[in-house]
Amino acid sequence: MPITSKYTDEQVEKILAEVGAVLEKHAASPELTLMIAGNIATNVLNQQVAASQRKVIAEKFAQALISSLEVPKAH
């Protein structure tokens, strides 16, 4: 999602492939996959981020997600 990252593409792609394999194994629908991704994000924010920073980080995360979407241009 971010343009620059302290993590390598290889690190991210490896974990993404493993998570994708688990979702595929369970035949997770797009809706279930998004629900799981949202729950993971919520749990990380609530358990690993200071309460004073949660909203700011959640807003930045949401904006990065929106920015990364491939949306067709209207004519």
Curated annotation (Swiss-Prot):
Protein name as catalogued: UPF0352 protein VIBHAR_03027
Organism, scientific name: Vibrio campbellii (strain ATCC BAA-1116)
InterPro entries the record matches: UPF0352, YejL_sf
Family under the similarity heading: Belongs to the UPF0352 family.
HAMAP family: UPF0352 (MF_00816)
Annotated disulfide bonds: none
Domain of life: Bacteria
Database matches in SUPFAM superfamilies: YejL-like
